């Protein structure tokens, strides 16, 4: 992964606006993901085929079960100015009307009902630590971390009930077992279909 270093500034005011401007104007190769992580604009290469396959499988389950007024987004930017972050999660479930009404290329992270991140080998700690804390701080109700690189044992962990910037683990399974998402989703994801490696 390559990163374009940007001098960290306060998360609010001109510093945040400048970071967003750089993020919006970064001309990355097609398929690459541009994010702001802890005040640094980063460019990550396209995800691996297995990563995309997992995203497609989770997307398929979610789209069948979510309320009609919600949608599943694959390239929706989530703004977290208090954490100097602009993330592009693998999947976001959010109310369609809110996304449709928000101008620009991103929405406040707090509008998300569920965020799904699938780790890549070279930046897994962003998803495990930085984004976990940021989504909890933004009070995103559910965060599903699909960690293909977890200590040699791929896992899926569902975090929820955010309070004071911290999540509680609601469920954690190794690939091969079912993971249940509580209401308002009330659905099960079969991780045995997730490719390994």
Model-derived regions: residue spans:
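Gly/Pro/Ser/Thr-rich low-complexity, intrinsically disordered segments predominantly at protein N-termini
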Residues: 1-138, 142-197
């Amino acid at each position: 992964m390559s990163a374009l270093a940007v001098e960290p500034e306060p998360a609010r005011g001109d510093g945040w606006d400048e970071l967003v401007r750089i993020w919006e104007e970064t001309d990355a190769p097609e398929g690459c993901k541009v994010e702001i992580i802890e005040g640094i604009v980063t460019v990550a290469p396209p995800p691996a085929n297995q990563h995309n396959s997992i995203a497609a499988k989770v997307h398929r389950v979610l789209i069948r079960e979510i309320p009609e007024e919600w949608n599943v987004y694959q390239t929706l930017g989530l703004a977290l100015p208090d954490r100097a972050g602009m993330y592009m999660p693998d999947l976001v479930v959010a109310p369609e009307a809110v996304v449709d009404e928000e101008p620009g290329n991103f929405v406040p992270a707090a509008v998300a009902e569920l965020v799904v991140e699938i780790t890549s080998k070279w930046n897994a700690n962003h998803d495990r630590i930085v984004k976990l804390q940021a989504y909890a701080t933004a009070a995103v109700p559910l965060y599903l971390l699909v960690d293909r690189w977890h200590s040699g044992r791929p896992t899926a962990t569902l975090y929820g009930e955010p309070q004071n910037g911290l999540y509680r683990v609601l469920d954690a399974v190794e690939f091969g077992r079912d993971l249940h998402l509580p209401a308002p989703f009330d659905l099960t994801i079969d991780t045995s279909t997730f490719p390994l490696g």
